[in-house]
């Protein structure tokens, strides 16, 4: 689902104009992004939590030349932990019916 798909679905169920819904959705995403960029976590009850984590520096390997090591510096990443309701709903899925996009 894309942002546009989300806007259309919300507009249909709420009978609001798509342009108004798009503005609210975009503003919501902008605020979430800004809070995370300031190092703040975000919690949506029953949905999940966005957290800022620091990955420690480590040594990696070049897959094309396994004998060559590469230093990977520490970095800040966003981690999402699904809430109880989302976890339970996803667990109800039939694994055979899930279409996975492998990026190809």
Show where each model-derived region lies.
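Strongly charged
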Residues: 1-104
């Amino acid at each position: 689902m894309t942002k546009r798909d989300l806007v259309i679905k919300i507009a249909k169920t709420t009978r609001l104009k798509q342009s108004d819904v798009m503005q609210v959705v975009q503003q919501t995403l902008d605020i979430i992004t800004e809070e995370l960029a300031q190092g703040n976590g975000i919690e949506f009850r029953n949905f999940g939590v966005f957290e800022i984590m620091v990955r420690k520096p480590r040594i990696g390997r070049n897959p094309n030349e396994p004998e060559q090591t590469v230093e990977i510096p520490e970095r800040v990443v966003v981690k999402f932990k699904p809430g109880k309701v989302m976890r339970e709903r996803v667990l109800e899925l039939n694994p055979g019916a899930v279409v996975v996009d492998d990026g190809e």
